[in-house]
Amino acid sequence: MYIFEILLKNPDSSIVLLENERKTKMYERWDKVLKNHPKYFGVLSRVKFVPGQSHQNFVNLMKCSDVLIDPYPFGGCNSSLESFSIFKPLVTQPSIRINGRFTYGFYKKMGMDEMIANNMEEYVDITTKLLKDKEFYDKQVNLLKER
């Protein structure tokens, strides 16, 4: 529901996801969500799947993205480090599992708490702020460059 909420709040945005073996399961889950939350029905067309990428193409895809989001509750590790290496802010929310806490730990170590959400509402709000507030976005980029 996180990505649906982001898309509801940001009608000019799309979300790009990499295809993988879980795509069918994701669609099944989304089907259940859409049945219970019809407000999300219109945003599904703005979720784009692209095939798996080579490392360089993946980094290039990240570079041309406006905002990166850590997939909650799964999180990231290598992809988070790659986003930092190209100075792209990444919204995260720590989960209870270790793989969902790496980005949180990286941000804590860097003193960048503004990119850490405590719940879905904050996650969506931080993502929206990065998309709409250039000063906030630039501040996060500069903090990454300083680290």
Label for each model-derived stretch:
Residues 63, 67, 71-147:
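Catalytic binding pocket for nucleotide-activated donors in carbohydrate/polymer assembly enzymes
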